[in-house]
């Protein structure tokens, strides 16, 4: 009974984290992230209701660079749209944190979760506590002289959310005790190595994807597989190792493509390793990986070719998390054996 309760709690928490991630991505894609210019962790749980309240929020927004440089002349109705998107993202973050933290406290004091098992839950708790601050730290970077958030802070904000999800999802599958029953002589060395490598390169790719989003790097070189008929674009050919490139949209898109190829190759090798073991569970994971990889690659290419349509770009982000989840599941099953 207690195990089932923890499973349901972790499952709901994982779904809520994913929902917050996706809404956060849409908030970024629609340019809505700087519409709320204050951070009010407690009093900010309610949106403006009266016309006067909306006018007050709009007046605050007009005092910052984004209004004057990007959205000058927008109507109150247009402001409401971007404001509510950012509001929903922040509200989801708060609700997700509460859904995780309140039951965790209950489970701890009721001894449902033993002290020896608490470390990953505490780490996730600490990350939840700082994530709101990190989000505001990111937003604040776009409220100063430039109406654009720091792409590094954006990537940091995203990666913390992914780490939280990783911890919760791993505890979820661990709690379900979904282990393999395979003779001990079966060699798991290669699948274990490649699943670990796959997790690493997917993390790197998610980080780079956030940099692409932060610099609007998906709006240039909208061709595939080459960039203006070249593999390495002219802009970075002669100064490839210059650290300033990390502020260059062309360089960031190029690196995102390169790591994308790496993700594809590593996951294909992992699929091959899993199929060679000939175990039903691992075969199922291999097929799931094929589907997730196809969706991730195809939506990534379409996002680029069509200059970042919001729906396709959001699906692309979602499948990055789905792909990571399947690889984590694979890693757990192999390691548990």
UniProtKB/Swiss-Prot annotation:
Pathway: Porphyrin-containing compound metabolism; heme A biosynthesis; heme A from heme O: step 1/1. Pfam families: COX15-CtaA. The chain crosses the membrane at residues 6-26, 87-107, 119-139, 154-174, 192-212, 258-278, 285-305, 308-328. It is found in: Cell membrane. It catalyses: Fe(II)-heme o + 2 A + H2O = Fe(II)-heme a + 2 AH2. The keyword Membrane applies. Its cofactor is heme b. It comes from the Bacteria. GO terms for biological process: heme A biosynthetic process. One of its GO terms (molecular function) is oxidoreductase activity, acting on NAD(P)H, heme protein as acceptor. Its EC number is 1.17.99.9. One of its GO terms (cellular component) is plasma membrane. Keywords: Cell membrane, Heme biosynthesis, Iron, Membrane, Metal-binding, Oxidoreductase, Transmembrane, Transmembrane helix. It is a multi-pass membrane protein. Catalyzes the conversion of heme O to heme A by two successive hydroxylations of the methyl group at C8. The first hydroxylation forms heme I, the second hydroxylation results in an unstable dihydroxymethyl group, which spontaneously dehydrates, resulting in the formyl group of heme A. Interacts with CtaB. Belongs to the COX15/CtaA family. Type 2 subfamily. This is Heme A synthase. The gene is ctaA.
